[in-house]
């Protein structure tokens, strides 16, 4: 979809929808929302619609960073303990590595 | 786009396999000939291939002094080479003073082990080469688990052990492969001699002879981890498209154990009557191991003791009526147990003790059938075990008892020991008797039963006192060159011990001792000694070939099926349990009641379709005549799995009262020999390859679609047909 052809009203609506969808534990949607509407939010002259877009984009950025921190922390934590072959880490592992713990 | 597609298709279409036989000299390595991973509850041991230890230049370590080169990484011989090495090493050079260098070397990829051909004699004291620990089975020791002793307090194998914990308990960084085939060994040696052997001035140059080998294990960590990962509920998302079950990463070491009951007691038809009898269990272990686990004949560790028990069993079998009558009168019985996996924390006896406690030994009971009556641990009076027969210093044997239990039942035990002494004396051997209440039982199957019952007594008969005299217990080198004198002495010892077993058993049951002590068949002992010990393979001698009668088939291409090995392994990949089973049937089986059975089919029907499941009927040849007959015996050949790693006994999972040894499933590849060129040569070849590729691209790039399209209409048009 080429959003440059959309009106500001539709852009706000789309940005809002993506933000709400991302709020359903879908951080990748927030990241897409951020990249998609970043120029409208921060690189073009401000107006009432773009202010709203900026609001959603900032919220998407904050949410994305939050998720990145949470997921990275979990990954480091999980991998640290997974390498010790603990019961709970094995339970959450999808494929056991062959020849190593 | 099409050009790229053509390039991709050409590259993808090239199969390099076709060139491999021109690049590599491949030597097939069967299962069991290489070091692989084993586990106990807490650790992993053995070898694993990785990028660092697959390839290397072949070097030789022929003598003690050559280990100096290991420290310098052979820099003086191969100054331009900076990679790793595969060292050709005779097994007898693995010693106390060399093992640390092998362990710590940073320039070894691996070692190629081979038998040097140097003969070792049973009494040879210059070679301390036991691959077992200073305290074998220390973690499973009754006294440790009963908190009477610290870990490894009695270093009984300190004279022979190469390392404190044994070579099987080392997590090696290197790989190991054992070459037993002389042709393969010659090929490697020739490759070394042609390319790697330094010239007289000490110099050498490219190309070198290199070797690659890879053994990849599936499992890692320890028994607990790999046992858990093998379960279907180990993962939240268990998705295995092939079978639906979790793939097997490792398996519990297990194999057949043999239990023979000369005078079996049947279960009562209704199972209401519990018969209480007393038993003496005569036992010898049937397993051994080496640094590469499977490479272990176990001549003294296993075979001589087994022969002495077999000879006693045969004597009993030839006059079974007397024993039966005495047992019926005294309500005391003797049975024979050959436990497997005893050198690995008592796998066989641990499982047997567990089954006894649960009323499942020796058979699972079905109420509608008659079986051998279950034996409970409290019914075991004595465990008479023999160990390391044939290597006594002089003519002296020792009896080992548990001091405290001995004091509790001194009179009866003294009587048993007295009969043993008489048996030994009849062959001019002396016996050193127990010294007092502080006596401890050396590593023996008794430890498993001692944990199950507080009264079972040990009577361990062996040619050592406080420490093992034989210095190659559980070792690749437990394979001797027997001189005529040494052979004769060993046979005498076996005969004496066999007589002692018979004497003690006869007195326990109530048979007149004098009637049986003279009945040990020395000729049989000599024959079995030559077959099992002197011969190169189990079925090389006439006696065993006749006993086989065409029944033995090498089912697997594994070391244990093609060579003499007494290692327990993870599957039934060794021939020895079959050999021992047939010998036990020969010793105790009888065809008196089955003389009318003339075919294998009718013999097997006897066992299958009867409610009386106490006896087995085996269509087996007589090893003297080769004539088949249907032998009736009460012999149970049973796979025993340690309860700690048996999926059938989840309540005992990883219980350290039992053995937790497991083996990894592994993929073994062949040894590849190849020529190693200097790095500059390889860079030149890469450059040529890149230039060739570029030229090819340009050549293809100049073509168009029409280059490859033959206009079939053109000749026709020339012939006058319209286009």
Swiss-Prot record, chain A:
Transmembrane stretches, start-end: 18-38, 58-78
GO CC terms of this entry: endoplasmic reticulum membrane; gamma-secretase complex; Golgi membrane; membrane
What residue ranges lie in the Cytoplasmic compartment? 39-57
Question: Biological process (GO) annotations?
Answer: cell fate commitment; embryo development ending in birth or egg hatching; embryonic morphogenesis; germ cell development; nematode pharynx development; Notch receptor processing; Notch signaling pathway
Summed up, the tissue specificity of this protein is: Expressed from 100-cell stage in most somatic tissues, including neurons, muscle, intestine and developing vulva. Little or not expressed in early embryos.
One Pfam family, short name please? PEN-2
Q: Residue ranges, Lumenal compartment?
A: 1-17, 79-101
- InterPro entries recorded: Gamma_Secretase_Asp_P_PEN2
UniProt topology in membrane: Multi-pass membrane protein
Subcellular location field: Endoplasmic reticulum membrane; Golgi apparatus membrane
Keywords linked to the UniProt accession:
Endoplasmic reticulum, Golgi apparatus, Membrane, Notch signaling pathway, Transmembrane, Transmembrane helix
Tell me if Transcription is a UniProt keyword of this record. Answer: no
Described by its record, this protein's role is as follows: Essential subunit of the gamma-secretase complex, an endoprotease complex that catalyzes the intramembrane cleavage of integral membrane proteins such as Notch (glp-1 or lin-12). It may represent a stabilizing cofactor for the presenilin homodimer that promotes the formation of a stable complex.
Q: Which family does it belong to?
A: Belongs to the PEN-2 family.
Q: How does it assemble?
A: Component of the gamma-secretase complex, a complex probably composed of the presenilin homodimer (sel-12, hop-1 or spe-4), nicastrin (aph-2), aph-1 and pen-2.
Name of the protein in question: Gamma-secretase subunit pen-2
From Swiss-Prot, chain B:
Cellular component annotations (GO), alphabetically ordered: gamma-secretase complex; plasma membrane
From the record, give the transmembrane residue ranges.
679-699
Show which residues sit on the Extracellular side of the membrane: 17-678
For this protein, the record's Pfam families field holds:
Ncstrn_small (PF18266), Nicastrin (PF05450)
Domain of life of the native organism? Eukaryota
| Keyword set, alphabetical order | Glycoprotein, Membrane, Notch signaling pathway, Signal, Transmembrane, Transmembrane helix
Q: Example GO biological process term?
A: Notch signaling pathway
Q: Which family does this protein fall into?
A: Belongs to the nicastrin family.
Q: Which residues are glycosylated?
A: 40, 181, 271, 328, 409, 627
Q: Does the keyword Disulfide bond apply?
A: no
Q: What is the lineage of its organism?
A: Eukaryota, Metazoa, Ecdysozoa, Nematoda, Chromadorea
Residues in the Cytoplasmic compartment per record: 700-723
Q: Does the keyword Transmembrane helix apply?
A: yes
UniProt organism field = Caenorhabditis elegans
Question: Where found?
Answer: Membrane
Q: What is this protein called?
A: Nicastrin
As given in the record, the signal peptide range reads 1-16
Q: What is this protein's function per UniProt?
A: Essential subunit of the gamma-secretase complex, an endoprotease complex that catalyzes the intramembrane cleavage of integral membrane proteins such as Notch (glp-1 or lin-12). It may represents a stabilizing cofactor required for the assembly of the gamma-secretase complex.
The record's subunit annotation is:
Component of the gamma-secretase complex, a complex probably composed of the presenilin homodimer (sel-12, hop-1 or spe-4), nicastrin (aph-2), aph-1 and pen-2.
Q: How does it sit in the membrane?
A: Single-pass type I membrane protein
């Amino acid at each position: 979809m080429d959003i440059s052809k959309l009106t500001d009203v539709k852009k706000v609506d789309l940005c809002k929808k993506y933000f709400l969808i991302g709020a359903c534990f879908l951080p990748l949607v927030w990241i897409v929302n951020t990249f998609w509407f970043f120029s409208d939010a921060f690189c073009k002259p401000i107006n009432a619609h773009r202010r709203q877009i900026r609001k959603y984009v900032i919220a998407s950025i904050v949410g994305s960073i939050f998720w990145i921190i949470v997921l990275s922390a979990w990954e480091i934590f999980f991998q640290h303990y997974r390498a010790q072959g603990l019961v709970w880490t094995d339970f959450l592992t999808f494929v056991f590595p062959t020849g190593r713990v | 786009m099409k050009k790229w597609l053509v390039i991709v298709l050409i590259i993808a279409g090239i199969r390099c396999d076709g060139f491999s036989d021109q690049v590599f000299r491949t030597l097939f390595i069967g299962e069991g000939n290489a070091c692989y991973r084993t586990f106990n509850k807490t650790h992993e041991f053995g070898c694993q291939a990785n990028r660092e230890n697959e390839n290397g230049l072949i070097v030789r370590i022929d003598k003690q002094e050559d280990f100096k080169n290991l420290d310098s990484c052979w820099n003086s011989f191969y100054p331009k080479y900076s990679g790793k090495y595969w060292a050709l090493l005779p097994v007898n050079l693995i010693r106390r003073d060399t093992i640390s260098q092998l362990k710590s070397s940073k320039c070894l990829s691996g070692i190629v082990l081979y038998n040097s051909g140097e003969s070792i004699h049973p009494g040879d004291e210059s070679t301390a080469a036991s691959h077992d620990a200073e305290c074998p089975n220390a973690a499973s020791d009754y006294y440790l688990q009963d908190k009477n002793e610290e870990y490894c307090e009695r270093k009984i194998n300190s004279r022979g052990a190469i390392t404190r914990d044994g070579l099987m308990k080392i997590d090696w960084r290197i790989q190991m492969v054992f070459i037993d085939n002389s042709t393969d060994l010659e090929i490697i040696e020739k490759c070394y001699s042609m390319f790697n052997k330094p010239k007289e001035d000490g110099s050498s140059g490219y190309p070198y002879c290199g070797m690659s080998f890879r053994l990849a294990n599936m499992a890692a960590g320890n028994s607990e981890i790999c046992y858990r990962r093998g379960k279907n509920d180990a993962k939240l998302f268990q998705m295995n498209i092939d079978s639906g079950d979790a793939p097997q990463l490792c398996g519990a070491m297990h194999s057949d154990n043999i239990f023979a009951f000369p005078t079996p007691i049947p279960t009562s038809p209704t199972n209401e009557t519990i018969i209480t009898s007393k038993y003496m269990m005569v036992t010898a272990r049937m397993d051994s191991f080496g640094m590469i686990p499977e490479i272990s004949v176990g001549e003294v560790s296993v075979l001589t003791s087994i022969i002495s028990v077999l000879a006693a069993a045969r004597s009993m079998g030839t006059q079974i009526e007397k024993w039966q009558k005495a047992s019926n009168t005294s309500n005391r019985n003797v049975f024979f147990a050959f436990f497997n996996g005893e050198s690995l924390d008592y796998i066989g006896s641990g499982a047997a003790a567990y089954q006894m406690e649960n009323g499942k030994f020796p058979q699972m009971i079905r109420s509608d059938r008659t079986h051998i009556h279950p034996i409970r641990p409290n019914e075991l009076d004595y465990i008479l075990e023999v160990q390391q027969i044939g290597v006594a210093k002089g003519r002296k044997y020792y009896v080992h008892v548990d001091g405290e239990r001995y004091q509790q039942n001194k009179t009866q035990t003294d009587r048993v020991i007295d009969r043993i002494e008489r048996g030994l004396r009849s062959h001019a051997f002396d016996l050193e008797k127990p010294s007092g209440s502080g006596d401890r039982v050396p590593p023996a199957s008794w430890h498993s039963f001692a944990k199950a019952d507080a009264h079972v007594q040990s009577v361990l008969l062996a040619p050592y006192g406080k420490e093992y005299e034989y210095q190659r217990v559980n070792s690749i080198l437990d394979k001797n060159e027997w001189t005529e004198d040494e052979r004769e002495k060993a046979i005498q010892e076996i005969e004496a011990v066999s007589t002692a077993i018979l004497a003690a058993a006869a007195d326990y049951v109530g048979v007149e001792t004098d009637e049986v002590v003279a009945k040990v068949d020395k000729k049989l002992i000599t024959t079995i000694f030559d077959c099992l010990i002197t011969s190169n393979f189990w079925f090389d001698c006439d006696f065993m070939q006749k006993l086989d009668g065409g029944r033995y088939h090498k089912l697997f291409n594994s070391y244990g099926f093609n060579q003499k090995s007494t290692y327990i392994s993870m599957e039934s990949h060794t021939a020895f349990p079959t050999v021992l089973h047939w010998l036990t049937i020969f010793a105790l089986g009888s065809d008196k009641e089955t003389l009318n059975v003339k075919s294998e089919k009718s013999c097997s029907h006897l066992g299958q379709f009867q409610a009386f499941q106490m006896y087995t009927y085996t269509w087996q040849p007589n090893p003297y005549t080769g004539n088949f007959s249907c032998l009736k015996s009460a012999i149970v050949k049973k796979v025993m799995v340690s309860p700690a790693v048996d999926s059938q006994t989840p309540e005992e999972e990883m219980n350290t009262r039992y053995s937790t040894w497991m083996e990894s499933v592994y993929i073994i590849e062949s040894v590849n020999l190849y020529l190693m060129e200097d790095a500059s040569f390889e860079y030149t070849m890469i450059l040529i390859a890149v230039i060739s590729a570029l030229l090819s691209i340009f050549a293809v790039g100049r073509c168009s679609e029409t280059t490859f399209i033959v206009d079939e209409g053109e000749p026709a048009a020339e012939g006058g047909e319209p286009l």
